[in-house]
A protein has these predicted regions:
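Polyanion-binding surfaces on beta-sheet-dominated domains and ring/shell assemblies
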Residues: 1-192
Length: 194
């Protein structure tokens, strides 16, 4: 499928919502199927969990990764780059950088802009203390997803937290990592066991 953009840099056939200042209201562009109530927000306040997102404030919602991907597609980008800042058994930090396509909000040939100037970066981490037991096996992926979500959200001024960004540990103790496992089959360790 090929997406066609008009002279303003917007996808043809898409109904965009606008703010009073004529910029795009990217928050309004999030389809309801990509949102759901933030269970933690309601539990912390001993309030019943709503069955729909209707009428909820942004701080009472979470956005799915699918919603962030949809926003990035609507906005348009040239490329996405990831840099691993830190990668240890119990802590991974990743920086995501996105080269956005110019549009009327930040045109390519505006004063001070040159091709490639529409770049935004953000960073996120995943640790054994802020992920669930299952996710602790995939810290690199979780950190990359969190960085992507933050990069898109912050560039487009979206104040709904991404589901991928929140602490999913539920207060449980992290899985104990045995640092010596990586050396378990090293020749010296095999000899020491005999």
């Amino acid at each position: 499928m090929t997406y066609k953009r008009n002279a303003a840099g917007l996808l043809e056939g898409v109904k965009y919502e606008y703010n009073e200042d004529s910029s795009i209201n990217w928050r309004a562009m999030i389809a309801p199927e990509h949102l759901y109530p933030n269970k933690g927000w309601f539990e912390m306040r001993n309030q019943p969990m709503p069955h729909s997102v209707e009428g909820l404030e942004d701080n009472q919602l979470l956005i799915k990764l699918s919603g962030i991907k949809e926003l990035a597609r609507l906005r348009g980008f040239r490329s996405i780059h990831y840099d691993v800042i830190k990668c240890e058994l119990d802590h991974v930090a990743v920086k995501c950088g996105i080269d956005w396509l110019p549009n009327f909000e930040n045109p390519e040939h505006d004063a001070g802009f040159t091709s490639g100037d529409v770049h935004f970066e953000d960073i996120a981490n995943a640790t054994i203390n802020n992920t669930s037991s299952f996710a602790q096996k995939f810290l690199e992926t979780i950190a990359a997803n969190r960085a992507f979500v933050r990069c898109v959200r912050n560039f487009l001024n979206i104040h709904i937290v991404g589901a991928d960004e929140i602490d999913s540990s539920n207060g449980t103790s992290p899985v104990k990592i045995q640092a010596d496992n990586k050396d378990k089959f090293a020749p010296i360790n095999i000899l020491m066991q005999k």
